[in-house]
Curated annotation (Swiss-Prot):
It comes from Canine adenovirus serotype 1 (strain CLL) (CAdV-1). One of its GO terms (biological process) is symbiont-mediated suppression of host gene expression. This is Shutoff protein. The lineage of its organism: Viruses, Varidnaviria, Bamfordvirae, Preplasmiviricota, Tectiliviricetes. Belongs to the adenoviridae shutoff protein family. Residues 656-675 have a biased composition (Basic residues).
Amino acid sequence: MSEEPVSGTTVEIEEDTHTPPNSPVLETFSLSPEPEAEACPNTDRYLSANLLCKHLQRQSAIVLDSIKDQLQVPTSVSELSCAYERSLLCPNIPPKQQSNGTCEANPKLNFYPTFLVPETLATYHIFFVNQKIPVSCKANRAKADKALTLQEGDCLPDYETMDTVSRVFEGLGGEVVAENALQNNDSVLVELKEDNPRLAVLKRNLSVSHFAYPAVHLPPKIITTVMNNLLVKRANPSADVSELDPDGGQEVVSDTELSRWLNTSDPETLEKQRKLVMGSVLVTVVLECMQRLFTSKDMVKKIGETLHYTFRHGYVSLACKISNVELTNVVTYMGILHENRLGQTTLHHTIQGETRRDYIRDSIFLILIHTWQTAMGIWQQCLEEENLKELAKLVQKIKKPLYTETSQRLMGKQLANVVFPPKLLETFNKGLPDIVNQSMMQNFRSFILERSGILPSMTCALPTDFIPIHFKECPPTMWPYTYLLRLANFFMYHNDLCYDMEGEGLLEHYCRCNLCTPHRCLATNPAMLNETQLIGTFDIRGPGGENGAESSSGLKLTAGMWTSAFLRKFESSDYHAHKIHFYENQSKPPSVEPTPCVITQSSILAQLHDIKKAREEFLLKKGQGQYLDPHTGEPLNAAGPSVESGHEFQGDGRHREPKRGRHFRQRGGPRKPPRAHAGGEPDVRGTTS
């Protein structure tokens, strides 16, 4: 049956259109006859000639703004790049702080290369110590994960000195070489029989003998001043030979003076004492300063909180869920709060077992390195010539006590008391560590591996793979890295990051560490659980103001208010900073009874629960409409035989007649009319009937 064509003009198809053989002629119809469009439309109105130049104009304005305060115009690309980075990343005027505490977005950063590492901020992070990898490194220890396993009751690790480690062994020890191992004399890594899959692939694809370890030494100004006054006088560089310091390169303490202090002229004894002092200046004082910075109770707590943000773990994960705000988008650096939504905090959930522990341990190690380097960079920048002169005077006072001390640990403590005073330590404890995410540490990890000549995308290497796990298996210059590795391992177990203990229901965000249980965990704090059920369910206000004005005072528990109080909630008496002491393994109750965060009085909490329950019962019994469970969506007041209904329907399904029953009798006067819904709007719990 043919159809009549639609009225309109017919437009024939172009001749170059290819159609199958014996196909009908294709025609298109225009419903409204209009003049034909121009063959070549004018696009000047859409993209003008000057439109694309706005990008260059904006970038030129930023570059011009970066050099306006300089006395001389930069004449090279490097000078201009440095000025450009300083203007963007280190402005003279600090960025404006928003109401939520973070800095406002800087549109100038849109013109900085996104994945380029800025040189201005990396004042201390770009320095490395290229050193030969010990054969006894962690990668050549097949049972390193088992050796690093910690249990209930284990304490903070301590560092070693030459007092306890007199000899160092760098070798494979009792490790068994794999039968099919490749013979590679250029690589330190050896294929072992019990290597895990990650290390087996790494050793087969990587040949390496040296590694660029991140610099962890004290600020250069400090080291130079201490060495000039304790070890060897440094010769001042000068272009004129006549101006060279004749005392340059000479020992600060002569053999005559040292023999008089030690009451001996034995050359071996004098040389041994000099080595002890040199070791304390170059190694032990660094270890002592690290221990003082990272092991105070407040610092251990702050490191634990940082790790909970970095790995979106425990109480931080619970706070994100209840507040419906991704708190892990916040990062800090040098006292400035930033909001960045590109960071990842859940990458560790994609791996399990030993690989997961290796990744988390390495990430925490990098966080400690990053924190230490940040502190050293700030310290270096703050030192002036007057500070160094006063430091030289203090070092001169302890010169004789150091050279007459026989314990290298005590030497390090005496020296740390001078160069790392309590005031400086207190300042660092207040501002560090920074809150970071896993993406930042992954970039830091790639930066370290690239400086070591290792391509991160083609190997599965971690910086901690090239660090020995025992002090007796590495040279003293590697001891700071071993100490930070063991500290990172302790923080991993102390904050319960190595195992996934989460479950369903109340155990969804369960963490066994002292920061979470028992006070910030719904499974162990029933009072706080009851409080969370009241969030957003009430709004209590006082009497109204004059002329019907609303009350200015009231009580309303919002998710934001509860989350703020929840994040501040902490009981120091139930926190064990220097020991793994999980709450679930204890038979005694907590020192402080777990309480809610905002509504701390149990009587008020109970009354609010009774009001909430009575309101729910009233809505289910007296309210009209169908009420749905907010979580499952199931009807809470399902339709059924009603003792209040006066209609029973009969019929064939199409025409039903109401039937009066005995329950339709009117008692106590005429029946009240049903409540009317305003505009038919649904209740917050369900939908209107």
